[in-house]
Amino acid sequence: MTYRVIQWATGGVGRASIQGIVSHPDLDLVGCWVHSAEKVGLDVGEICGMDFLGVTATDNVKELLALDADCVMYAPIFANRKEIVRILESGKNVVTPLGYFYPGKRDVSDLETACQRGGVTLHGTGIHPGGITERFPLMVSALSRNITHVRAEEFSDIRTYGAPYVVGEIMLFGKTPEEASKSPMLDVMGGGFLESIDMVADALGFALDDQKRTQHAVAIATRPIDSPIGIIEPGLVAAQRFTWEGTVRGQAVITVRTNWFMGEEGFDPAWSFGPEGERFEVEVQGDPNSKVSFRGWHPESVAAGLKRNPGIVATGIHVVSAIPYVVEAQPGIKTYLDLPLVSGRAAQEFAK
């Protein structure tokens, strides 16, 4: 069976998603929403640096919702909840990396109602959050008994993130520590990571305390550091670490952490990626302990990452891979705990 898909937004994740949709044997790209006026009317292939696809980009929501489509891959910079409700009510499933990984403790009655009205499903997935923080820890946890702690952690050179404005003006790299302390990222990312913690806790049976612990720490440059946002002068923020913890009687049992550095030299404190370098890590402490490092999701160089970042690609493809399973699911908000095991597909030259 072929599932008809609309791509919503064509940023880094969106472009990777389009590549994934086009190469997936069970998916067909039938529409594309774009934010930028200069992209309206262009063939989606041109936007993504691909061959002609025969799908024209538009910013006309009404026109897109009138299409005969099974699913929308929803990936703008920020989620518009009313827009998601509208898509669901139009009878289209939604997969997204922008949250809804495990929203049971939030008021999502409007989304649940929209799912029931449209007879469709909403599913949040991705990499971090959306994979490293819940799907993979849960898989690895099956190898241990008496689990006492689960950790999911990212170590990344933020210079490879191809959105300089976001890095400088939203993440607040290159600012003073006082300015960076006002970063919205702890709350913005926490919306997803706290859901991840709840999912792991519920699946493993941890009796979490009511409040989660959070921490935002920064390291400053000790020398000028060249970066895509310009020179980061000594005394300005060149590395950031965000931590979210689920605790039981005050003891951390689930830890999610993001380490974003402008390289890994010239910091105070002297943070580094360690001998293992850039990676994503999952660790389960129990009997026995397990530790898994995921590599290949970081570019080989800053220049390569600004052209194509494998971590961004992996995020988009993970969302796309879920589409057939989401379309076949019963209406409602569905998580990893509800869906079958999601897998990718063989390259065309090796397929059945």
Give each language-model segment a name.
Residues 97-99, 126:
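Short beta->alpha connector loops at strand-helix junctions that form conserved
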Residues 8, 12-16, 59, 106, ...:
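Conserved active-site and cofactor/substrate-binding residues in soluble primary-metabolism enzymes
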Residues 1-90, 205:
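N-terminal glycine-/serine-/threonine-rich beta1-alpha1-beta2 phosphate-ribose binding loop
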Residues 99-121:
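Rossmann-fold NAD(P)-binding glycine/threonine-rich loop
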Residues 226-352:
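C-terminal active-site/capping subdomain that shapes the small-molecule cofactor and substrate pocket
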Residues 132-142:
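Alpha-helical support elements that line or immediately flank enzyme active sites
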Residues 8, 141-270, 278-280, 309:
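Active-site-lining helix/loop region of Rossmann-like oxidoreductase modules
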Residues 93-95:
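A short hydrophobic/small-residue beta-strand
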